[in-house]
């Protein structure tokens, strides 16, 4: 009997038809992004994420994030970061730097240890929200808790959150120093110290705070610095605080290959009319329009609305809850155009943005580089248009020289193959809903409208009302969201006009528009502009 059982056991083969890749079958992988990509992200060594010998649970998060193969910066940084060595990494905007430090951080964290083990510093609140969402999505199968904290929010909520296990803190330096200084955030076992947009974090306004934060970390911590530009302040910090850092420099050229740059000479009083002409002629999926001051941001947003286009705006003087809401809604495609200051030049990744317009030309090359990097993300196509006044001509020349790039005069017709894809509906949206606060992000009666491509920008009526009223207009009427954003129902397609980009009437102080609506308040109880009534019958 025993011999018979032994014979049967020897003949038994364990085979559940499993294959090495079978575990991928149950993953919730988003649709493949079929858009053309440039060498900024395709010039790799041919590695796969599996080649890094990371946990399967982390691989599951990577593939469910929509990643297929590592980009050049990820190929270079991830293996080194996994060894615990300090890193100085320089790579272009929009080439995957965030995942290059988040993936090794998630791999090295011990979920059973309830102490903070990784600190990720970023310069802006919006970038903190975005980075924390990447951490949560990539680490969703690991049981790792991520906390985001920034200035402008209540300290009480952060204190309560830190009473629970937190493995990664993502935030701005001032708030984290405040928490550490009050002995609320225990960084004694935080072995990973990461700075994204390191050049900004090591500017004079942040340097002292960064130096103080380092005192709360163990001496054998790992420091990783990532940025597109490395000024002398970064070298000074590295020499003082980093041990034999591994240097990565993938900046063979400063600008992204997929971005086409143009300029148009425009008198100040004609800029709004020029912008109107661009809207009518360009095939915009989403656009970001930059101004050099917060006052001009609000004024331009109101003028764009008077012209009949849906528009949000955002700047540093706004209430934090309103900034979060605008960022969340624009990221999810509720509106086509965003007017902002340099608040959103750092790290913000919105795949659907294919046009960046510098309504006000920046004063230096670094700001220009980060602005235009909001389009053409992850090797895709983008368009940057600069409205140049007579006073800007020397800045234009200096920026071209410093960046080693060419900004060409704008042609009468911009070929669509420079910045337009045939199927914009396939452009990836955020993997998960960017809920920063349930009460802020879930207004009733709101339509989540995905922008679609048209021959010109979508024109809608606009009237400034209360942002939070959540009312929806009937067909052909205006839907408005006053605090920082205006949007309309009943789109009217603009078929384009025979105009030059830099000629015509209208100015920043008085663009064309239809009937004027009631004057109401905008953000922060500031004085609002005149709304645009329904367009007159043609």
Curated annotation (Swiss-Prot):
Where is motif Q motif found?
Answer: 47-75
In this protein, which residues make up the domain named Helicase ATP-binding?
A: 78-248
According to the entry, every stretch annotated as the Helicase C-terminal domain falls at 258-418
Q: Name one GO cellular component term.
A: P-body
Q: Where is this region: Disordered?
A: 427-538
Q: What is its EC number?
A: 3.6.4.13
Q: Gly residues bias: where?
A: 504-517
* Predominant subcellular localization, coarse grouping: cytoplasm
Please, one GO biological process term? Answer: mRNA processing
At which positions is ATP bound?
A: 91-98
Q: Which family does it belong to?
A: Belongs to the DEAD box helicase family. DDX6/DHH1 subfamily.
Q: What is this protein called?
A: ATP-dependent RNA helicase dhh1
Its source organism is Botryotinia fuckeliana (strain B05.10) (Noble rot fungus)
Which taxonomic lineage does the organism of this UniProt entry have? Answer: Eukaryota, Fungi, Dikarya, Ascomycota, Pezizomycotina
